[in-house]
Curated annotation (Swiss-Prot):
NCBIfam families: rplA_bact. The lineage of its organism: Bacteria, Pseudomonadati, Pseudomonadota, Alphaproteobacteria, Hyphomicrobiales. This is Large ribosomal subunit protein uL1. Part of the 50S ribosomal subunit. Keywords: Repressor, Ribonucleoprotein, Ribosomal protein, RNA-binding, rRNA-binding, Translation regulation, tRNA-binding. The keyword Ribonucleoprotein applies. One of its GO terms (biological process) is translation. One of its GO terms (molecular function) is tRNA binding.
Length: 232
C-alpha cells in the first residue's frame, strides 16, 4: 500500500488541477507519469454541450488517427463469396456469415471491430442486443456497413476509432500509447477532436466542447485548454 500511495503522490506532483494546460504540455506530463510496467494507453475525454437523451443531440462518428492507436485491432467481417475473399486478403481476422453469427450468439466475441456488407445486415441485426452494448454493431454512418470491405478492414487496422457520446455528454477514446512521441499523440488527438467537431449535431446549442482531459491507463486526468485541442 505504501508503494501505491507513493506512486500516486509522485504522479500528482507538480500538477495544478485548477490549471488548463496547453495540449502539448498536458501530453508531455501524462507521458512522463506513465511509468507502469506495460505500454500504457493514452486516452482523451471530452465533455460536450449536448444531451444525448434527445435524438437531435446524439454524437457519433469515426476518427482516423494518422499515427494509429498502437493496438493490434482484431476485425471481424460478415460477408459471403467475393467480398469474403476481399476481407481475408485485406487482413481481416475473422470472416464468416451464419457460422460467425452462431459463434457470436453463443458468446464468443474475440474481435474489436465488426464490419458487414449491406446484404448481411438482416442476419447481423439479430445480434443487436449482443453487439450494440459493446459498440460493435456495424453502422453505415461510421463506415462499417459497406461493400468496400477491403478499405474498411485496412482503416480499422490502421487507426480508425469509433466514438459515441455517453449519457453524461462525454466522448472518450484511446488515441495512442505512452511509447509514442509527443507530436504523434498530439496529431492523433487533434484528428480525434476534428472528427468530434464535424459530428456536431444540429440540436447542439451554445458551447460544444466544454472540457477536455488527457490521461494514461494507470495515470490521472490532466485538464487541457480546449482551444489548444481544436486549433490547427
Amino acid at each position: 500500500m505504501r508503494k501505491v500511495a507513493k506512486r500516486i503522490k509522485d504522479i500528482r506532483k507538480d500538477i495544478d488541477f485548477n490549471e488548463l494546460y496547453a495540449l502539448k504540455d498536458a501530453v508531455s506530463m501524462v507521458k512522463e507519469r506513465a511509468v507502469a510496467k506495460f505500454d500504457e494507453t493514452i486516452e482523451i475525454s471530452m465533455n460536450l454541450g449536448v444531451d444525448p437523451r434527445h435524438a437531435d443531440q446524439m454524437v457519433r462518428g469515426v476518427a482516423h488517427l494518422p499515427n494509429g492507436t498502437g493496438r493490434n485491432v482484431r476485425v471481424a467481417v460478415f460477408a459471403r463469396g467475393e467480398k469474403a475473399e476481399e476481407a481475408k486478403a485485406s487482413g481481416a481476422d475473422i470472416v464468416g456469415a451464419e457460422d460467425l453469427f452462431e459463434s457470436i450468439n453463443s458468446g464468443t466475441i474475440d474481435f474489436d471491430r465488426c464490419i458487414a456488407t449491406p446484404d448481411m445486415m438482416l442476419l447481423v441485426g439479430r445480434l443487436g442486443k449482443i453487439l450494440g452494448p459493446r459498440n460493435l454493431m456495424p453502422n453505415p454512418k461510421v463506415g462499417t456497413v459497406t461493400l468496400d470491405v477491403a478499405n474498411a478492414v485496412k482503416a480499422s487496422k490502421g487507426g480508425a476509432v469509433e466514438f459515441r457520446v455517453e449519457k453524461a455528454g462525454i466522448v472518450h477514446a484511446g488515441i495512442g500509447k505512452a511509447s509514442f512521441g509527443v507530436e504523434k499523440i498530439v496529431e492523433n488527438i487533434k484528428a480525434f477532436a476534428s472528427a468530434v467537431i464535424k459530428a456536431r449535431p444540429q440540436g447542439a446549442k451554445g458551447e460544444y466542447i466544454k472540457r477536455v482531459a488527457v490521461s494514461s491507463t494507470m495515470g490521472i486526468g490532466i485538464k487541457v485548454d480546449p482551444a489548444t485541442v481544436c486549433s490547427e
